[in-house]
Amino acid sequence: MARGGLGAEEASLRSNALSWLACGLLALLANAWIILSISAKQQKHKPLELLLCFLAGTHILMAAVPLTTFAVVQLRRQASSDYDWNESICKVFVSTYYTLALATCFTVASLSYHRMWMVRWPVNYRLSNAKKQALHAVMGIWMVSFILSTLPSIGWHNNGERYYARGCQFIVSKIGLGFGVCFSLLLLGGIVMGLVCVAITFYQTLWARPRRARQARRAGGSVGTKAGGLGGLGTRPAFEVPAIVVEDTRGKRRSSLDGSESAKTSLQVTNLVSAIVFLYDSLTGVPILVVSFFSLKSDSAPPWMVLAVLWCSMAQTLLLPSFIWSCERYRADVRTVWEQCVAIMSEDDGDDDGTCDDYTDGRVCKIRFDANGATGSGSRDPTQVKLLPGRHMLFPPLERVHYLQVPLSRRLSHDETNIFSTPRAPGSFLHKWSSSDDIRILPAQSRALGGPPEYLGQRHRLEDEEDEEEAEGGGLASLRQFLESGVLGSGGGPPRGPGFFREEITTFIDETPLPSPTASPGPSPRRPRPLGFSPRRLSLGSPDSRAVGLPLGLSAGRRCSLTGSEGSSRAWGRPWGPGNPIFPQLTL
């Protein structure tokens, strides 16, 4: 772009300056709208959504800084013949343009790689913290792009004829051979990686997965034919990754794993990523690579190369929003985008993870699964956590609940919430308990014992009375009978004493060797009482509880061991719901 006269090449550049400026403003608004639309439609930002937002942000910077700078300088030169590029503006333009060009190439390649990873290895993708890896990839992309693109500004250029000496000759052949070769190789690597990942994704989606599904159905059908008595094996669906939400004892979301996408959503996202990759390769990657190759070969930079590079860069910033808008998953209306803008401007600090911190109303946040690990039919969206009133945190319902990555001492435990403070009505107690759960009941007069001195004086007599009552057949009772007689008083009157001590229940919960209190083994024959203290065999209210510092007078009157099989539906009685509450909060 040598200065002097209004030659044909100068006239062509200046005639396009106003168009570049208008298209840059339109691209800036369109990409900003796309970022707000994705944020409004997807409350939980996944790796693909994050990469799409970063790609749109890169296009905003491309339209706002280098392209707008080039257009403004050309308009200024058209208005004043004395104005021209200076060294500082040219260096800023070259550094920002090549930084954003490389960042766009690598972000598109990373987008296609994450989609291939999610389709080809779905379980590994969900267990590998892909969101953090996407953030690290973006930081690495920007670091590499910025370092390489700023090297020409600090001396890595052709010293014979510097690219900013006459105008601003930003084609790679005018900057330097070393920079041109490195830039072309990095650009070629990003293009090839994106195309390979898209090809693997399409193969996995269109051929490999349906073929494996057909093979699984044929294998299941043959097994079902051989073992027809088992039933249902021939029609077993293909494996799907369950949606898992990990919560602490207060229901606070700690981490989550997304489940398998529906066929419609998977196809939409795959088509969108593939379209973005082909858009970039056809409009930006390959044209810039061809221009760089021919410019290095001929050691020249004619005006058509400048026009081709700038218009290709502008075209991709305009077409990306239209591609994302065509995907129904990320299409938001004006009202939704406006609400998202208001939420961002108001800087609302409320929790947006679908959980609640205040559990004084007795609600429990949880995600339920069936026995095969699939999500229940009640809620397919893992971000929408259901608040179920009237549920107690000590005992899960019939359907299996997956509490993952929560320490045993924190699982259904007492650390962060006081679940023993609120008294409940007699009708809110458990209506039915498993017949395999045996509860020993001592006489009513034994519950009125005093402190440890009285208990030590009558311990042997109480043990003899226990054995006599058990021999007579009156030592076993249901949990409901135990609670009504021991906590509520006989005849449903006012309570005469506490049901269990807090230390008793928490010790039972924390010291159980199984994944949860609900998964204890089946009943076993009664064994002689061991002489030594074993915390894993400590029953609620046993005399041995003195080793953990429990009051002995009241704990001696209640001895309880809760057992039951996890696989038995009778272990939890009839189904629980808001109209059929379960074990309430116990009082002290």
Swiss-Prot record:
Biased composition (Low complexity): 530-540
Biased composition (Pro residues): 514-525
Residues where Phosphoserine is found: 413, 435
Cytoplasmic compartment residues: 39-49, 113-133, 196-275, 325-588
InterPro entries, A to Z: GCR_153/162 (IPR022347), GPCR_Rhodpsn (IPR000276), GPCR_Rhodpsn_7TM (IPR017452), GPR162 (IPR022348)
Subcellular location: Cell membrane
Membrane topology: Multi-pass membrane protein
One MF annotation (Gene Ontology) recorded for this entry: G protein-coupled receptor activity
Topological region Extracellular: 1-17, 71-91, 155-174, 297-303
Residue ranges of the region described as Disordered: 511-545, 561-588
Keyword ATP-binding among UniProt keywords: no
PANTHER family: G-PROTEIN COUPLED RECEPTOR 153, 162, G-PROTEIN COUPLED RECEPTOR 162-RELATED
Described function: Orphan receptor.
Protein name: Probable G-protein coupled receptor 162
The organism of origin for this protein: Mus musculus (Mouse)
Gene name as annotated: Gpr162
